[in-house]
Swiss-Prot record:
It comes from Rickettsia peacockii (strain Rustic). Substrate binds at residues 11-12, 99-101, 162. Its cofactor is FMN; NADPH; Mg(2+). This is Isopentenyl-diphosphate delta-isomerase. GO terms for cellular component: cytoplasm. PANTHER family: ISOPENTENYL-DIPHOSPHATE DELTA-ISOMERASE (PTHR43665:SF1).
Amino acid sequence: MLKDQNLDIERKQDHIEINLTKNVESTLKSGFESIHFIHNALPEINYDSVNTTTTFLGKSLQAPILISSMTGGTTRARDINYRLAQVAQKAGIAMGLGSMRVLLTEPDTIKTFAVRHIAPDIPLLANIGAVQLNYGVTPKECQYLVDAIKADALILHLNVLQELTQPEGNRNWEKLLPKIREVVHYLSIPVIVKEVGYGLSKKVAESLIEAGVKVLDIAGSGGTSWSQVEAYRATNSLQNRIASSFINWGIPTLDSLKMVREVSKDIPIITSGGLKSGIDGAKAIRIGANIFGLAGQFLKAADTSESLLFEEIQLIIEQLKITMLCTGSRTLKDLAKAEIRL
């Protein structure tokens, strides 16, 4: 057990370092580069009246942005999460925590995840890999993770390709959907199911919605490739070659968004995976997202300073607002109907 705990910590340290220092981008594009807004040269809107506010999980957001799940469990991760939480609270946006599995075996790591005292007002998302339900994690333990950080929802992330390219990864993905359904019905708060960079298909979305999942984070291809991250962690040539061969795997984010929105007009969708700017976020809103998530550039900024992170988030928000005004969109509902060309 101690060996497994140490491996969890070591893996989290590796993931931070690799994401900060290596090129781990998918060779696929997110797809949003193919969408272009029709410029409105006469919007008849005062910039000060452009309204980016929305609600998510019953809480108000100043902008439809999620700091996507990244890290936890280590001292460096604690510092990053504290900065992320401070700035998320200041900016009025949502935040997801990294995988909290380690907390089930290492209670002392709670200090690297517990940020509610820093961010009392924002939507805060707990997180664990869905496959852990096949390896002994129970609905009661999922509720424990939620309670430990006073979360507004629990993310169950689907990372099958990442697990299969880890030498220590979990291989048993059989009969997982019934266990997800069990967690959905056990928890006192909503369950979000999230991919990690390879997209949700129409068929998977249908199954998850039928199981009672309340929010989907499509996390398509076009951003971080976790198989490429694992390629850098590989300890031998074979492991490296296996992981590297999936650099262009997955459903591009735009395609996944369209598929999932076709399944349901009502389910809240978080769109993430390869979004680089508020302009990309605006495109996601236009195609059917409720909020959009980013991680990579926030991680790099948060590892440096709170001020740099706040500047990065302000950049995203300003890009979004300018896009809204230049499309004649006073609100996010207006943006969802803005003219585009493909």
